[in-house]
């Protein structure tokens, strides 16, 4: 038996704001929604990953009050440093940037961090041995 990670379920204080955030910044799309929990339950996925990994987003959570130096986060890989900078610029305008773009030694790479409307941190990185193009990068 080999378990496979298929989803992450999140209770959030503002469902619509979280759905909008993940659409806008993470290019995720709603692939399913249904009535539930007094409102609705939403499944979101990256294009092409609808059958492999999703976020299940539900109403009813508490706002997470993470410290700026708390590195608990969801991580998304990008294809270039310029894309990291672009996300950071958009996040500055939206007032949700928590970690300015920075370079760290391998395997961390170049990254920035955003705060979603529920208080979760979301990292956007380039140069890690994960995600698009990572097959050419050795594991640490």
Protein language model features and the residues they cover:
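N-terminal beta-strand motif that seeds the catalytic metal site of vicinal oxygen chelate
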Residues: 1-16, 73-74, 129-140
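Core segments of cupin and vicinal oxygen chelate
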Residues: 2, 9-52
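Vicinal oxygen chelate
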Residues: 4-13, 45, 64-140
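Hydrophobic pocket/interface hotspot
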Residues: 18, 22, 84, 91
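Short beta-strand/turn micro-motifs at beta-sheet edges
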Residues: 58-64
């Amino acid at each position: 038996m080999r378990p496979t990670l298929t989803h992450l379920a999140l209770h959030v204080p503002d469902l619509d704001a979280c759905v909008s955030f993940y659409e806008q910044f993470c290019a995720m799309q709603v692939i399913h929604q249904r009535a539930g929990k007094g409102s609705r339950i939403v499944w979101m996925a990256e294009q092409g990953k609808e059958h492999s990994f999703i976020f299940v987003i539900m109403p009813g959570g508490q706002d997470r009050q993470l410290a700026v130096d708390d590195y608990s986060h969801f991580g998304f890989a990008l294809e270039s440093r310029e894309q990291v900078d672009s996300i950071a610029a958009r996040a500055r305008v939206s007032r949700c940037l928590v970690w300015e773009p920075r370079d760290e030694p391998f395997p961390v790479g170049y990254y920035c961090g955003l705060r979603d409307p529920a208080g979760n941190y979301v990292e956007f990185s380039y140069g890690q041995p994960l995600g698009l193009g990572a097959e050419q990068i050795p594991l640490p």
